[in-house]
Amino acid sequence: MSRRRCIGVFALALGIGLVIGLGGVMSDARSQIIDMGKYPNIAGGWGRSEVYQWARGQKPPLTPEYQAVLEASIADRATGGHGTDTMYRCFPPGMPRQMLMYSPMEIVITPGTTYMLIDHIHDDRRIYTDGRAWPQEDIEPTYSGYSIGKWVDEDGDGKYDVLEVETRFIKGPRTLDGLLPTHQDNQSIVKERIYLDKAKPDVLHDEITLIDHAYTRPWTVIENYPRYKTPGLPGGPKRSVPRPKFGSTWARKTIFSVRMAI
């Protein structure tokens, strides 16, 4: 066989292989198409109108040991210190504090994974919804943790209403806000129920339950996020994104809100 014919046969075989391969990829892509009609309309940007703290009155059930740490942190902040706040040392907020973000968040639903893209220091969360089990071996903790979730149709209408999430393997050091005690690696489990308000579909709720040795019982808080019409994102009514006031004024407000909570 001549050299030219050999090259021609090789090129033909390569072309057939590419067509078969691309056909498999396209078939796999078609099988991964998601029916967005079954999911809640959570497009657009979501933000918070409160300062970068848990809502006033949501008191954490601290053990006596950690209550003493909180009081010492409040006293230190009152005299100009940083208290227990790890973000003053440039650590990421971590879970669940990153859900207190004051910058917009976008939620993206894909087959098998739901993403939360948070503009504040470019945090992101990957919530696996592909039915996987928890890893049998320990995995390296990260500040966002390892999240497994499932979409639930609570009212039986054939459409999903709630995203239930559990997050483990959360890295430390981190605090839940600017004053609460510091948590280290793998000390917390976070459970969430994320859903749209039925009466106000431009409001997203996140029921966050924290299980941690610093608390006498699981602690549940509820955070609310209005929908923002963020540039480049489809969404609801146009709103301006609030920005907290940092510095001494912000610190005083923080201390005041925590004192009201305790």
Would you name each region that the model predicts?
Residues 13:
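Active-site bordering "gate/hinge" segments
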Residues 2-9, 17, 21-262:
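Hydrophobic small-molecule pocket/channel-lining residues, especially in calycin-type beta-barrels
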